[in-house]
């Protein structure tokens, strides 16, 4: 068993599940979308992104691209959340949180593509 591949797979899967945990629930209900889950998703996705820099294969480049998309989407979601909460004194509203969750859903899709690539790479691996 290769420890590097275990750690890589762990962070790819963790990035997808933490992001999914943030986006699940009613789109316009702010009580169902914890901001700390969004921040955790950003941190885990950045760690997964850093781990993907070492792979120089074509599938590694696609892994890196999916991670870049996910991180950019999550950073945009966090920036939007910060803007909405700091621009007025009221709590975040339904339409505002739905914009944040929509961006995080885009990142979840990128994480799903990364998971599919990881499984495809694992299935096609042949022992020597």
Where are the regions that the model predicts?
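Hydrophobic alpha-helical membrane segments
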Residues: 48, 64-83
């Amino acid at each position: 068993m290769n420890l590097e591949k275990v750690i890589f797979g762990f962070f790819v899967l963790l990035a997808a599940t933490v992001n999914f945990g943030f986006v699940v629930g009613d789109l316009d209900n702010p009580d169902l979308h914890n901001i700390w889950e969004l921040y955790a998703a950003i941190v885990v996705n950045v760690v997964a992104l850093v781990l993907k820099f070492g792979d120089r294969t074509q599938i590694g480049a696609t892994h890196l691209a999916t991670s870049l998309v996910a991180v950019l989407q999550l950073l945009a979601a966090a920036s939007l959340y910060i803007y909405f909460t700091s621009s007025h004194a009221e709590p975040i509203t339904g339409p505002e949180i739905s914009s944040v969750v929509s961006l995080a859903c885009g990142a979840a899709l990128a994480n799903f593509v990364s998971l599919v690539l990881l499984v495809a790479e694992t299935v096609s691996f042949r022992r020597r």
